[in-house]
Design a protein with these regions (language model features):
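Surface-exposed loop/interface segments of Gram-negative outer-membrane beta-barrel transport/assembly proteins
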Residues: 41-128, 165, 169-263, 281, ...
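Short acidic/polar hinge/loop motifs at secondary-structure boundaries
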Residues: 1-16
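Residue-level signature of outer-membrane beta-barrel architecture
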Residues: 36-38, 151-153, 189, 201, ...
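Extracytoplasmic
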Residues: 6-8, 27-31, 43-47, 263
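Non-catalytic regulatory/gating segments with a bias toward low-complexity or hydrophobic composition
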Residues: 11-12, 32-34
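Outer-membrane beta-barrel architecture
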Residues: 33-35, 47, 146-150, 186, ...
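Repeated loop/turn-to-beta-strand initiation elements of outer-membrane beta-barrel proteins
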Residues: 155-158, 194-197, 276-278
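Short, glycine-/polar-rich solvent-exposed loops and beta-turns at beta-strand/coil boundaries
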Residues: 3-6, 23-28, 176-177, 213-215
Length: 334
């Protein structure tokens, strides 16, 4: 996955016994050989190619409106022998809010019964929120750029390339993207008519920035949110939401991973007789990966201006207040 597609010259698949005979037991199910481009004798040649595009979410669920939600919720509760949670006046406010959202007259939320906090998502909280539309972008930028220079003489040939890939994520209001840098060098030497040498080096640096390590639970959390819950409050200050809400938690979390992979090879080929090549090859690879996960305690502002710390007991993807780092190294020589 670290290979720059612009540097690929050919892809060969070896299967079954043919792969095992060359690469051993680990290749019993086959081997994919990726050959990168190399330089040719002649003047230096400079090449550039780049692409810019956009990604968009597909098959996104369509949430019902808050008025529809209130009607179905009332019907469900009544059919189960319980009281309807939404009053007629609350449903009327839902409709008025939709026409003039987050206005001074319809801020979307009021006080709870005790007057010391915000109301729940029933009678005195009357938003019309499409949580999928709120949390996901309509489109996100993606781009790639590749620059290479190649050339050489009958004795020495070279090919050096650099690439950059950016893929923006689709989650809105937070950092969600990937950056990758590639640097490849491929050189070949005709030392003698019977002696050839080659050196290859492939370096890749990848950075991933996400709001969380596992985003699967995030999708489940937002699909469980009521459309009657607000995304904003009529007070200034830190977040203050009456129930679990991804808006404030996503801004307090962070997952970063930086990976560095450097693969090198040096080979020499001796041709004692025409048609008989003897090749000696040495390979080395260094992989370094550092991961960091941060999740804090979001602060919330009450209607009276007091700031409290939210424990976040319902958060499913990690414990709060944790800053976790991991660094791993690996290398081999063959």
């Amino acid at each position: 996955s670290n290979v720059n597609p612009a540097d690929v010259e050919s892809v060969t698949v070896l299967k079954d016994a043919s792969a095992s005979s060359v690469y051993g037991s680990r290749a019993a199910y086959g081997v994919v050989l990726v050959t990168t481009k190399s330089g040719s004798a002649g003047k230096a040649s400079v090449s550039y190619n780049g692409t810019v595009g956009f990604s968009s979410p597909v098959n996104m669920p369509e949430m019902m409106s808050s008025v529809e939600f209130a009607g179905y919720m009332n019907e469900m509760k009544v059919n189960s022998g319980k009281n309807a949670p939404f009053t007629e006046s609350a449903i009327e406010r839902l409709g008025m809010f939709t026409a003039d959202p987050y206005s001074e007259e319809y801020p979307g939320i009021g006080l709870n019964a005790a007057g010391d906090g915000w109301a729940s998502a029933y009678n005195n909280q009357y938003a019309d929120t499409d949580w999928f539309d709120y949390h996901f972008k309509d489109r996100s930028l993606r781009q790639s750029h590749n620059l290479s220079i190649s050339g050489g003489t009958q004795k020495v040939r070279y090919m050096v390339s650099a690439g950059y890939v950016y893929q923006g994520g689709l989650i809105d209001h937070v950092e969600d993207d990937l950056d990758r840098y590639n640097l490849n060098a491929r050189m070949s030497f005709n030392v003698k008519p019977w002696l050839k040498a080659a050196f290859n080096n492939s370096l890749a640096v990848t950075g991933i920035d996400r709001p969380m390590a596992d985003q699967t639970i995030f999708y489940a959390q937002i699909s469980d949110k009521y459309p009657t819950q607000v995304t904003a409050l009529p007070v200034e200050g830190d977040y203050d939401l009456p129930s679990w809400n991804e808006v404030m938690y996503l801004k307090e979390t962070g997952f970063e991973r930086t990976s560095v992979s450097d693969a090198m090879s040096l080979s020499m080929t001796i041709t004692p007789l025409d048609g008989w090549d003897i090749t000696a090859e040495m390979k080395g690879r260094l992989d370094v990966q550092k991961s960091s996960f941060i999740m804090g305690f979001p602060k919330t502002t009450r209607p009276d201006g007091k700031v409290v710390v939210t424990s976040g007991g319902k958060q499913g993807y990690q414990y709060p207040g944790m800053h976790w780092k991991n660094t791993s190294f690996g290398s081999y020589t063959r």
